Amino acid sequence: ALGAQSRTLVVCNPPYGRDGSALTSHSETTRIARHEGGLSPEELARAAARLLRSGGRFCVVYPAPRIYEMMRAMDDCRLAPKRIRTVHGVAGRAPKLVLLDAVKDGGSQLHWLEPLVLRDADGEYTDEWRRIYRMGAERRNG
């Protein structure tokens, strides 16, 4: 078991679909992977805050339309967002996801980072996305 205040970093890419509001799957495994079930933003923030030492970081990926819910839950658990970066599937379109980096007991200053754009207006992957993807593949392949 993971002890309280035993970690300096918690990273999470949780399922974000609200039960009953997104397309459901016939596969139990797929449903669990895509829908939050019993893992609300409040429960996720509480779990991260319990695990983190003061000054520890909580990094999470969350859907842009629901980011207020996550930020409110973080605030309730003394997790202060420090860096925020929007993720855009295509240049010029609204973000689909938000990358949040919060610090337990971290104060109130928030830094907005440049958006991460996956594809340009012509549908081609951006240079930054290619670098990120290549770096991940290199780490996996040793």
Which sequence ranges carry the predicted segments?
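Solvent-exposed, flexible loop/coil residues
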Residues: S6, G20, E36, E43, ...
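Residue-level preference for alpha-helix termini and adjacent loops
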Residues: P15, A22, R31, T86-G89, ...
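SAM/dcSAM-binding transferase cores
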Residues: A94-G142
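Short loop/turn elements that flank and shape the SAM/SAH-binding pocket of Class I
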Residues: A1-L2
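Mobile active-site "lid"/loop adjacent to the S-adenosyl-L-methionine
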Residues: Q5-L9, P14-E43, A47
